[in-house]
Amino acid sequence: TTNGAAKEICVALSATNGTQLWAAVMDDALYPQGGVGLDDGPRTTPAVADGSVFVLSSYLKLYRLNATNGAILWQRNLASLYGGTIIAHQNCASPVIEGALLFLNANTGTSTLMALHLADGSPAWRSQDEALTHSTPVLATIHGVRQIIFVTQSNLVSLNPQSGALLWRFA
């Protein structure tokens, strides 16, 4: 808790001895439909690249932290920026990184599947109108074609990771 309010916290531990290196306070830790109880979260896994830790909170807030000291380098409230909505049990999908892009489903009103630039969190592309699930996207090469695959509420959707162009959809 911070000032009496429950908060989601990202913690870095030493790989050598497990001691805490730093802790960064992120977002509110309120889980009214948490399934198990009010303390059932967060459920996402941070992604690490370019000396940074990227964290997507239960309430669709994306943070870039300095991997050395946990300082917040930038943050984006995806729900506010893109009209996203929080689903029951909050977000559970983790961000995925390849090269200079971070992939996620922000559950925005339109063009929900997106890639953001690691450097500043600005959109590289947004594509498709697909409702969020608790599934983390997967990068794969299938028949020689690199793709980012999302499980959504209605479909399995594959996109070109560089452009966001639809490769295939399975309902």
Q: Predicted segment positions?
A:
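Noncatalytic, solvent-exposed loop/strand surfaces
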Residues: 1-171
